[in-house]
From Swiss-Prot:
Binds 1 Mg(2+) ion per subunit. Plays an important role in the de novo pathway of purine nucleotide biosynthesis. Catalyzes the first committed step in the biosynthesis of AMP from IMP. Disulfide bonds: none annotated. It comes from Rhodopseudomonas palustris (strain ATCC BAA-98 / CGA009). Its EC number is 6.3.4.4. Homodimer. GO terms for cellular component: cytoplasm. This is Adenylosuccinate synthetase. It is found in: Cytoplasm. Belongs to the adenylosuccinate synthetase family.
Length: 430
């Protein structure tokens, strides 16, 4: 399989950035295919920390081509700010090594404002969005009124498209008792940014098709996690896009046959940001300790993550919905030193045992985890780079996870550093 798709197998924040960066050394092209700048990730390379939100991890690798696909919602100002920050850290970013789908949907300030207004008005019913305009931008895309990157190249037709967009948004704003938006200001702002954005514009589906036919290795970089998928996640506490592996095809314009190997990333425990069901959540001192050790705070938002034991039911479900061939297990070192660890092997729902997470919101809130206790390990796993360096009990824990989710571990990460990775099976050679 020449191409690899990386997806989160939990609720996001699984450590995809490090794994993608590690794999990108073997790839020619790294592609983002969904989401926006709401899903940040941190990379530590030679002691230098890089925080990415919108840009593919491939930008940190010289000689690699980074691509933002049509499935992404693209905030022009966030993009320019992120590029400037990374360039200040010595990262070279230009149209030579970064291409953006010309048909990508733009996130505008009005999307961010609407996102925040809705979330604040919802109060106790808030979903927990990042308030960065992701959902409203996807709404406009589906509603066929979005402004796309290619529209900035035609200033004759852009005003008409802005008016069509505002016919919807100004009606919403009147209902929310907010002032209407001036079309002229949006036109002026987009016109000013156009010269800085259009040099990156590309017919991405065509570019990737050419590269694939040339035999180039393509790495598809997913954002967030499969349990936040708008269809297969814990709805309505989900994101506004499809985050499962199949989106790699539609989010780039490539056919399903181009996808190849699917690598699912999951932590050795479970975390979640924001509201929504979390069967194995630990609201005690153990949960606090896991969060402290794992530095479980959002890269972009700084929000504290909820922590819990590994949920094999959920990861097994994700293996099925994403067609995952192998797992990359991260943050095993965070569990070092515990006398024992728990793994969720099933649920009880209204007194009945089940082996999946039901789709209904009420049922998801009522499921109770069934745990299996596994002996812990005292020896450190941190910075291990081979199986021989791992404690025997830690290996047993990994093997039990494989059995429970029905999928082999292909990679094991033992620290944020790129080199602290144990390779079991190379996804590009599987």
């Amino acid at each position: 399989m020449a191409n690899v798709v990386v997806v989160g197998a939990q609720w996001g924040d699984e450590g995809k950035g490090k794994i993608v960066d590690w794999l990108s050394e073997q790839a020619d092209i790294v592609v983002r295919f969904q989401g926006g700048h709401n899903a940040g990730h941190t990379l530590v390379i030679n002691g230098q920390t890089y925080k990415l939100a919108l840009l593919p991890s491939g930008v940190l690798r010289p000689s690699k081509l980074a691509v933002i696909g049509n499935g992404v919602v693209f905030d022009p100002q966030a993009f320019l700010d992120e590029v400037k920050k990374l360039q200040g850290q010595g990262v070279a970013i230009s149209p030579e090594n970064l291409r953006i789908a010309e048909n990508v949907t733009l996130i505008l300030p009005l999307h961010r404002e609407l996102d925040a207004t809705r979330e604040n008005a919802a109060k106790a019913g808030a979903i927990g969005t990042t308030q960065r305009g992701i959902g409203p931008a996807y709404e406009d895309k589906v509603g066929r009124r979005a402004i796309r990157l290619m529209d900035l190249a035609d200033l004759d037709t852009l005003p008409t498209k802005i008016e069509r967009l505002l016919a919807h948004h100004n009606a919403l704003r009147r209902g929310l008792d907010q002032p209407e938006i001036d079309a002229g200001q949006i036109l002026a702002d987009l016109s000013a940014m156009a010269p800085h954005l259009l040099p990156y514009a590309e017919s991405v589906w065509r570019l990737l098709d050419i590269k694939r036919r040339e035999g180039k290795r393509i790495l598809f970089e997913g954002a967030q996690g499969a349990l936040l998928d708008v269809d297969h996640g814990t709805y309505p506490y989900v994101t506004s896009s499809n985050t499962v592996a199949a989106q790699a095809a539609t989010g780039t314009g490539m056919g399903p046959g181009a996808v190849g190997y699917v690598l699912g990333i999951c932590k050795a425990y479970t975390t979640r940001v924001g509201a929504g069901p979390f069967p194995t959540e630990l609201t005690n001192e153990i949960g606090e300790e896991i969060g402290r050790r794992g530095k479980e705070f959002g890269v972009n938002t700084g929000r504290k993550r909820r922590c819990g034991w590994f949920d094999a039911v959920l990861v097994r479900q994700t293996v099925r919905t994403c067609g995952i061939h192998g797992l990359a297990l991260t943050k095993l070192d965070i569990l070092d030193g515990f006398d024992s660890v728990e793994v969720c092997v099933g649920y009880k729902l209204d007194g009945k045992e089940i082996d999946y997470l039901p789709a209904g919101e009420g049922a998801q809130a009522r499921v109770e985890p069934i745990y299996e206790t596994i002996e812990g390990w005292k020896e450190p796993t941190a910075n291990a780079r081979s199986w021989a360096e791992l404690p025997a009990q830690a290996i047993k824990y990994v093997r039990r996870i494989e059995e429970l989710v029905g999928c082999p571990v292909a990679l094991l990460s033992t620290s944020p550093e790129r080199e602290d990775t144990i390779l079991v099976q190379n996804p590009f050679e599987a």
